[in-house]
Amino acid sequence: MLRHSLRWFLRFVLVAVIIPIVLGAAISYARGWPESWRNARWESSGLLPQARDVPEALVMVIAARTGRWKSIFAEHTAIVLKPEGASDWTRYDVVGWGSPVRRNAYAADALWYGN
């Protein structure tokens, strides 16, 4: 009974965990990774409307793939705020463990290194 349960558990882990990770890695590799974060595109992706065209207050969490092999497992997230009636978005994000929160280092909906 235990042996049968262990066999089913291992099959589940293979199908639910291992195969998706391997497929994700293969797809990411096939698409190609940027050579360096210094050469990456950082401009606006065009996903957000102009802040002045949105009268209400908004809080958004945006995410983009990280660079190279980390993109298999991780995304970079940023919080984007717009107070009611404001004419600009405000973006907050952290790059690197223990680093301070950055404010408006890039466009609110900027592409990230892994994009």
Residue ranges and their predicted role:
Residues L10-S28:
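Hydrophobic membrane-insertion alpha-helices, especially the h-region
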Residues M1-R7:
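N-terminal Lys/Arg-rich, disordered targeting/topogenic segments
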Residues G32-L48, R52-N115:
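Glycine-rich catalytic cores of cysteine/serine-nucleophile enzymes that process amide/ester linkages
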